[in-house]
């Protein structure tokens, strides 16, 4: 952090609000590639990659601005030439975008540094850590009735991203360069290879587009910040990275124009005003839960669709928002199937000679392991077939038995660790069984034997560490408290380090 502040002169750039000259600084691209932290960036290094030099960057920008847009032709020779120019443009854009993504993050580095130095306290806007999502769902969802399952809309035009970023970065030259780069790349790839080029581009420039997408999501979440300030009872709990909006409150006069006058807005606010609204966002999905009725949630849905279409100038289909009743719907969120189950409870009461029954309905929040998506992921990784039957996984012949067992054991521990918050462990035990038997069959295949003959010849101690369940680990660690720990293990346990393996929530991890 000290080197970033030293070489980039962050305080000076912050006061001038002028980031464009930094694009021509060579050490920017060293920082963008995590270089230079172990040596002096300003010193000459003969082994340094010359493609990030000052002259190269200047030539790239000049060449992109002077590119002839009327080179598109139909014959084969010109098509090959166009493909050559397209590859050059992709290379140019990749180099500049890597440095630009680092530069536009400078205002946020400044804010973080000032916060660490105690100069300024960053407003949190009532944020929560991602670790609080599971306890929040467990504590609050059993008392709620309806939930809005919202898919966060994507901007349909690059100009929307540039306009949103304008409230964060006040340098017109940098924004103009970003607009030019995005438009030029989108137009060129649509003429050459739209699908393959855009896919490969998004993989190579994840940092820039992740920053632009987070800015878009922050603008989207500003709706709830605005409504919370209009109603002191509206509680907005965001579990995503919601940074502080800049100059947002200066746009209030424009926001209220949706309803006409300010008085009209205050008069219509009661339509979406409710003392117990909860908002959660994770990745590309968000939830808005309430105790209200179905009519109340429909009003919220209409309001959000109208606001997004007006404010973001994009068509937002109402079908991207689903209104679900928690008692009749299983919510797929963060790798779990969650619902609110009603447990009937009958109590017999007797007064003198008369007795009567009292029926109580107790709501309980359940979190289940989604067995079908997990089996599909295991089948994709060649651990089982599509029906969930374990199979042997082809491995390299040079891998030792301990390495194979360690790989299977690590996957099993990660899945067990992540889904330890499940209220029912049956599906989790099935996943463990698939991995354990697949490991045994893989080892037997390597030694050209059957599973039974392999275990009989080498002994079951080979898989003892891998087959050891978590309850056995608890018993060996604390034998005197085994009975109490058994009850703890069978209950829900939320681990605080699940963020490190949160790719399992998408069932897309490379097993």
Swiss-Prot record:
GO cellular component: chloroplast
Protein name per UniProt: Maturase K
UniProt KW keywords: Chloroplast, mRNA processing, Plastid, RNA-binding, tRNA processing
Name of the gene: matK
Major localization class: plastid
Any Pfam family hit: Intron_maturas2
HAMAP family: MatK (MF_01390)
Family indicated by similarity: Belongs to the intron maturase 2 family. MatK subfamily.
Biological processes, Gene Ontology terms: mRNA processing; RNA splicing; tRNA processing
Known role: Usually encoded in the trnK tRNA gene intron. Probably assists in splicing its own and other chloroplast group II introns.
Superkingdom, natural source: Eukaryota
GO molecular function, one term: RNA binding
Matching InterPro entries: Domain_X, Maturase_MatK, Maturase_MatK_N
Compartment(s): Plastid, Chloroplast
Lineage: Eukaryota, Viridiplantae, Streptophyta, Embryophyta, Tracheophyta
């Amino acid at each position: 952090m000290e080197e970033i502040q030293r070489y980039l002169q962050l305080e000076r750039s912050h006061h001038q609000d002028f980031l464009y000259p930094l694009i021509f600084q060579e050490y920017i691209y060293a920082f963008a590639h995590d270089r230079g932290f172990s040596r002096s960036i300003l010193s000459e290094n003969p082994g340094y990659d010359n493609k990030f030099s000052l002259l190269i960057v200047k030539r790239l920008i000049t060449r992109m601005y002077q590119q002839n847009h009327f080179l598109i032709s139909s014959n084969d020779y010109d098509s090959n030439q166009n493909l050559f120019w397209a590859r050059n443009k992709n290379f140019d854009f990749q180099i500049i975008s890597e440095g630009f993504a680092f530069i536009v993050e400078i205002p946020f580095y400044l804010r973080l540094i000032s916060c660490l130095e105690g100069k300024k306290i960053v407003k949190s806007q009532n944020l929560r850590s991602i670790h609080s999502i599971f306890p929040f769902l467990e504590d609050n969802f059993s008392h709620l009735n309806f939930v809005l399952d919202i898919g966060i809309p994507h901007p349909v035009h690059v100009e929307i991203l540039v306009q949103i970023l304008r409230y964060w970065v006040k340098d017109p030259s940098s924004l103009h360069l970003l607009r030019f780069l995005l438009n030029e790349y989108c137009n060129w790839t649509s003429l050459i290879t739209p699908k393959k080029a855009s896919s490969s581009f998004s993989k190579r420039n994840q940092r820039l587009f992740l920053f632009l997408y987070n800015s878009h999501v922050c603008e989207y979440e500003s709706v709830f910040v605005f409504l919370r300030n209009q109603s002191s009872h509206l509680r907005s709990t965001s579990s995503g990275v919601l940074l502080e909006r800049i100059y947002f409150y200066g746009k209030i006069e424009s926001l209220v124009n949706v309803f006409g006058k300010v008085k009209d807005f205050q008069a219509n606010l009661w339509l979406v005003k409710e003392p117990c609204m909860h908002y959660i966002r994770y990745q590309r999905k968000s939830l808005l839960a309430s105790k209200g009725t179905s009519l109340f949630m429909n009003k919220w849905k209409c309001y959000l669709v109208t606001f997004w279409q007006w404010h973001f100038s994009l068509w937002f289909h109402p079908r991207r928002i689903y209104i679900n009743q928690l008692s009749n719907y299983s919510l797929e969120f963060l790798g779990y199937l969650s619902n609110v189950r009603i447990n009937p409870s009958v109590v017999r009461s007797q007064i003198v000679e008369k007795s009567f029954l009292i029926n109580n309905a107790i709501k309980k929040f359940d979190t289940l392991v989604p067995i079908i998506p997990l089996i599909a992921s295991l089948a994709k990784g060649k651990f089982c077939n599509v029906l969930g039957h374990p199979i042997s996984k082809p491995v390299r012949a040079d891998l030792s038995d301990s390495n194979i067992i360690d790989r299977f054991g690590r996957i099993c521990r990660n899945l067990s660790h992540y889904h330890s918050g499940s209220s029912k462990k049956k599906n989790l035990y099935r996943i463990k069984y698939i991995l354990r038997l697949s490991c045994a069959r893989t080892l037997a295949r390597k030694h050209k034997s059957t599973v039974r003959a392999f275990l009989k010849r080498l002994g079951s101690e080979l898989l003892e560490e891998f087959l050891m369940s978590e309850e056995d680990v608890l018993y060996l660690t604390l034998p005197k408290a085994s009975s109490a720990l058994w009850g703890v293990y069978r209950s829900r346990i939320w681990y605080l380090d699940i963020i490190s393996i949160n790719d399992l929530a998408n069932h897309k991890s490379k097993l």
